[in-house]
């Protein structure tokens, strides 16, 4: 069954937020899959203001940022290692838990615990009114020339390239760690596609339910 195309005119785009104040805030965007929890009550996000990242050189201030807290990283690491231990029990039985000859399994699980912890702690996402960053890599979301969705290890994600040649990749689940982070990024993508003609693919349009630019009068499309 083919889905009917939705179209959007440039004049109907949501306004761009002010670079300094971030107002008006972009509307709630489609495709958000994270927990819509206020950041001041979330147990899984870092709250230490000293760890807030700086904006990219010459760009507008940071309006929102997200990094997994130590507690959140520990919980995630323990859950993944317990899952791995459960799989090991299904394939090897439970003898490995106490038997010395299976020390290699314990060593693997210990290493996995550390690796997963630092994996979750290492990702820091931030956004201003017109840019989004992962660590030191960033793009201007209102100047995107290419926005495509791809399958990455751990889930589907998006590839962004702006007019300055900067590129950024992230998984949708990562950017869904914070509602405002998602809304700011989506609004920029929407403007780039509708007003700027950024190149997209079918997977992105399906995932984010992106509308198409309103065709010119007399166009056959």
Predicted regions and their residues:
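N-terminal membrane-targeting/pre-transmembrane regions
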Residues: 1-93, 217-221
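Acidic surface patches and DE-rich sequence motifs
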Residues: 18, 128, 162
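Hydrophobic, well-ordered secondary-structure segments
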Residues: 55, 83-93, 109-111, 116, ...
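Hydrophobic alpha-helical transmembrane segments
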Residues: 72-76, 94-109
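N-terminal transmembrane hairpin
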Residues: 81, 88, 95-101, 123-124, ...
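Conserved beta-hairpin
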Residues: 103-150
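Acidic, Ser/Thr-rich low-complexity segments on the non-lumenal side of membrane proteins
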Residues: 134-176
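A membrane-cytosol interface segment of integral membrane proteins
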Residues: 163-221
């Amino acid at each position: 069954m083919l889905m009917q195309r939705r179209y959007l005119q440039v004049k109907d785009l949501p306004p761009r937020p002010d670079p300094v104040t971030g107002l008006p805030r972009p509307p709630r965007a489609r495709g958000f899959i994270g927990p819509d929890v206020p950041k001041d009550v979330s147990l899984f996000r870092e709250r230490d203001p000293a760890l807030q990242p700086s904006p990219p050189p010459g760009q507008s201030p940071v309006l929102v940022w997200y990094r997994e807290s130590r507690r959140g990283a520990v919980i995630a690491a323990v859950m993944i290692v317990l899952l791995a231990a459960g799989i090991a029990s299904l394939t090897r039985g439970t003898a490995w838990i106490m038997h010395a000859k299976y020390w290699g399994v314990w060593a693997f699980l210990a290493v996995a615990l550390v690796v997963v912890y630092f994996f979750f702690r290492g990702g820091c996402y931030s956004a201003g009114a017109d840019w989004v960053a992962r660590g030191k890599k960033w793009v201007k979301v209102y100047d995107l020339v290419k926005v495509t969705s791809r399958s990455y290890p751990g889930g589907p994600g998006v590839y962004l390239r702006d007019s300055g040649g900067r590129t950024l990749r992230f998984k949708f689940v990562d950017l869904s760690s914070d509602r405002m982070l998602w809304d700011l990024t989506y609004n920029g993508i929407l403007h780039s596609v509708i007003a700027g003609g950024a190149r997209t693919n079918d997977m992105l349009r399906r995932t984010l339910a992106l509308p198409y630019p309103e065709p010119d009068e007399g166009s056959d499309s």
